[in-house]
Amino acid sequence: QKFVSERGGGFLMLGGMESFHEGKYLRTPIGDMLPVYLDLDEETAEPPGKVQFQLAREGWLQPWARLRDTESDERARLDGMPAFEVFNRVRALKPGASVIASVRDEKGGELPALAVQRFGRGRTAALMVGDIWRWGMKDAAAHDDMDRAWRQLVRWLISDVPLRVQTSAEPVPADANGAERVQVRVRDEKFQPVDDAVVTIEIEPVVFAGTAGAAGA
């Protein structure tokens, strides 16, 4: 949990018989990180049968969740995905989380399939489909699509990972000389703040070459 919340790492839970509610992750540090609630009774947790994967509204707005340039091509790709048979139900989405993809069961019901959220300095995701590998087994093109989808999801998960040494500069208010205030944040191996860090900053002048005719402009 600290790896995600303090280090800025990413965490993804995949569906399966030992995941989510079925894996007894309720009231555990891992369960607390997930973007979904796991408290279900056994009747509610029953698998929904075969389900069809589709993008939710938020998924259509996120470039990393899409694999095609146009909506029509993306819908055609989604329609060509196989039905999935292993699915973990969840009770609800946690506040601040987003549903990127959903599934539709044989009765027309819609259930969250891919949910994401920020958790401290990091990000977490939950993919409730347990046999997503079926997608890549369809043909070579589908396998390439699945590989690309994994890459894009992982990039999203780790896109905010901070460096151990970070610098920022901002103008000093009401300073006629254009002074800048430079801040340096240093963290140790466990990504805890270092209060007595010794930092050396080297500043070099930048010379801008003039363009021809600039003097007479």
Q: Where would I find each of the regions flagged by the language model?
A:
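N-linked glycosylation sequons
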Residues: 1-217
